[in-house]
From Swiss-Prot:
Organism: Rhodospirillum centenum (strain ATCC 51521 / SW)
Family named by the database record: Belongs to the CheB family.
InterPro entries: CheB-like (IPR008248), CheB_C (IPR035909), CheY-like_superfamily (IPR011006), Sig_transdc_resp-reg_Me-estase (IPR000673), Sig_transdc_resp-reg_receiver (IPR001789)
Bias (Low complexity) ranges: 162-172
PTM info: Phosphorylated by CheA. Phosphorylation of the N-terminal regulatory domain activates the methylesterase activity.
Protein name in UniProt: Protein-glutamate methylesterase/protein-glutamine glutaminase of group 2 operon
Length: 394
């Protein structure tokens, strides 16, 4: 997989505290063992529970503190999607990573789980042989678990036993809409962030969004406010192939915006949203005066393909100062270099704030670099974009 969120320096358990506590949930004992060994190859992670189905996970979570759960989707007795709301009810601060196969069905269920409150997902290799030799999978898994483990501990103290979850079938949770994962509480800052002046007038000609860990949930929230926007909306979310196809479909159905994976050579049209397809960089080129999609297999940037930086650089070449760039929750610093190009051209950058980011890596990078004209809670970003997008053209 070339869509890894990249190598992120994640603060481990501080002050000599225990390693991050993880529960692995999978009906295959072999897979549980392989995932456990991959996780425990990192000294900052300890697998404290390994169970075979969702019901066992619920029972275990009610008895001991867990920071992160790696949750399989398809299991007997109680599957991952059905167990998810009960796990979050038992401990709203626990971070859940859905482990999914690289299939359309797996991608669809993973995105439904993200809408229901899962913090992230990870595509599993399709066989134990692939899993045994998948160094990229192991690296991505350990990085996500450490980042989300740190987030869980900032969200609230881990208890020596959580409130017992309501058994499945009793007073079922509502399934409409979507649930944002528990936000990460802001850490004390070393100093105030520098915010750039917002241009007093002028309307952007394009809206560009970059995101990674926690991104799908954030995208649904933001794009729900932009269904009337006349600008094209270009999105790079760190995801593998198949998942990006399903993400575009979910955006269309959830947000009321016509959205699809970007296709090489197609003209970019206002009022539509385009998602970078997995394993391709999404660029914009000028063909006979028409902004046009160009997909490339150029080397990953920031260990990512698709990556936000090349998309933003190409957008600046096409639209100059008429670019509005939005960096949402995600690991790493992808998007920072591209936002530097946006600012140098006279465009505007918006970053998600730390308190509402699942992981404040990407938005934190642009915020601490002084590139943002606004650093906002997630629920304020959509209305803010809507206001700027509706300005009169200068």
């Amino acid at each position: 997989m070339n869509d890894s969120p990249g190598r992120t320096t994640v603060s481990g358990p501080s002050g000599g505290s225990d390693p991050f506590r993880v529960m692995v949930v999978d009906d295959s004992a072999v897979i549980r063992g392989l995932i456990t060994r991959a996780l425990e190859s990192d000294p900052e992670i300890k697998v404290v529970a390994s169970v075979a189905n969702g019901q066992m996970a619920i029972n275990t979570l009610s008895r001991q503190p867990i920071d992160v759960i790696v949750l399989d989707i398809e299991m007997p007795v109680l599957d991952g999607l059905s167990a998810l709301p009960h796990l979050l009810q038992a401990d709203p601060n626990v971070k859940i990573v859905m482990a999914s196969t690289l299939t359309a069905k797996g991608a669809d269920i993973s995105l439904r789980a993200l809408r229901a409150g899962a913090a992230d997902y990870i595509p599993k290799p399709s066989s134990t042989r692939e899993l045994t030799g998948a160094d990229t999978f192991k690296r991505e898994l350990t990085e996500k678990v450490k980042a989300l483990g740190a987030a869980a501990r900032r969200s609230g103290p881990r208890r020596e036993g959580t409130a017992a979850a309501r058994p499945p079938g009793a007073a079922a949770q509502p399934t409409s809409g979507y649930t944002l994962p528990s936000p990460v509480r802001a850490k004390p800052e070393t100093g105030p962030l520098t915010v750039r002046p917002l241009p007093p007038d002028g309307r952007p000609d394009v809206i560009a969004i970059g995101s990674s860990t926690g991104g799908p949930q954030a995208l649904f929230e933001v794009l729900g406010h932009l269904r009337g926007a006349t600008q094209p909306i270009l999105i790079t979310q760190h995801m593998p192939a198949t998942f990006t196809t399903i993400l575009a479909d979910h955006i269309t159905r959830q947000c009321g915006i016509q959205c699809a994976e970007a296709k090489d050579g197609e003209p970019i049209v206002g009022g539509r949203a385009y998602v970078a397809p997995g394993d391709f960089h999404f660029l914009v080129v000028n063909r006979n005066g028409v902004p046009t999609v160009q997909l490339t297999k150029d080397a990953p940037e920031n260990f990512c393909r698709p990556a936000v930086d090349p998309m933003l650089r190409s957008i600046v070449r096409q639209w100059g100062r008429r670019v509005l760039s939005v960096i949402l929750t995600g690991m790493g610093h992808d998007g920072q270099k591209g936002c530097e190009s946006v600012v140098q051209a006279g465009g505007v950058v918006i970053g998600q704030d730390e308190a509402t980011s699942v992981v404040w890596g990407m938005p934190g990078a642009v915020a601490t670099a002084g590139l943002c004209s606004a650093i906002l809670p997630l629920k304020e970003i959509g209305p803010f974009i809507q206001k700027i997008a509706a300005r009169r053209a200068a």
